[in-house]
Amino acid sequence: TFTTLVTFGGAFFASFPLFYSTSFGGAFYVWMAILLVFVIQAVAYEYRRKPGNVFGEKTFNVFLMINGIAGPLLLGTAVGTLFTGANFTVDRLNLANGAGSGSATVISQWTTPWHGLEALTDVSNVFLGIAVTFLAATLACQYFMNNIDDKTILERARQRMIPAAVCFVLFFVAWLGMLLFADGRAVDAAGRISIEPYKYLHNFIEMPYLAVVLLLGVVAVLWSIGLGWRGRRNAIWFGGAGTVLTVLALLLCAGWNDTAYYPSLADMQSSLTIYNSSSSLFTLKVMSIVSLLIPFVAAYIWYAWRAMNRKPITREEIRGDDHQY
């Protein structure tokens, strides 16, 4: 997950540098909190069973629990701001005003002292964060069912998957309902941004292929839950694929069809769109060429995971001191 987050940030930096500077530079409290919980996860995995560690194994287990809850909760909340908006302003005149002054030029500024943590006060953001947390728990249980060769652990994972999956479905459906009936920010041909009621619902209606992708993703996740409930080991493949399709459809809905993908709550005209925040044409062309390698990278990832998971993990390997992650 941490590697995916870093890749996500790097891709956004290259393609949408203004979003990168605005979100990562303005909402840095929430991004630093996300970074911290993943750092303590890595430290916990490395040292929890090292002989002579001064904190003890239970302390590192608490670190893992913090990461398992706070990590996806904060990530989901941060992603939710792509639809609900954030408190920032953008003033491109600072580029001209700062030219030749010898000082750093800042064109986007955060308007609250909480620097992103205020997203936790929005019900829609929190619902998405909770849904992501329970989805992570559901997929984790499905992964254990598929990759651990132990009947006791398989049954325990199946039993724990069911309540997590039910909670995920409830919170995700509630969040999706709020999204479809929420106001969005639309951009016209002149670049002016205005509020459009039911904007995201209109996006799915006007782009039915996105609605189909979203439906396929949701059905795949629900199918994986049904398979997991019956104790099928292959549930994770449907759950993982369905999650990717669902996230893809939602992110495209946030930015396509003349939609501001990062609305500003402080100044509507500062909202970020694909048109006003993308990188140079040359950079986008280079990234388009490089993106042709994505199918090969995806195939390699599939092959590598398939090779690692070909032999199920045993209880003895889990109890061992060697690296098993």
Residue ranges and their predicted role:
Residues T1-Y47:
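Membrane helical hairpin/interfacial module
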Residues G9, L36-V43, G76, F134-A137, ...:
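Alpha-helical transmembrane segments of polytopic integral membrane proteins
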Residues P51-A235, A249, C253:
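Long, contiguous internal "core" modules enriched in hydrophobic/ aromatic residues
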Residues G85, R233-A235, N257-Y261, Y300-T314:
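Juxtamembrane/interface segments at transmembrane-helix termini
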Residues D150, L214, W223-L227, S279-I313:
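Alpha-helical transmembrane segments of multi-pass membrane proteins predominantly involved
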Residues S194-P197, P263-T283:
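Short, membrane-exposed interhelical loops at transmembrane-helix boundaries
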Residues W237-T246:
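Central hydrophobic cores of alpha-helical transmembrane segments
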Residues R310-Y325:
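Short, highly charged, low-complexity non-transmembrane loops/tails of multi-pass membrane proteins
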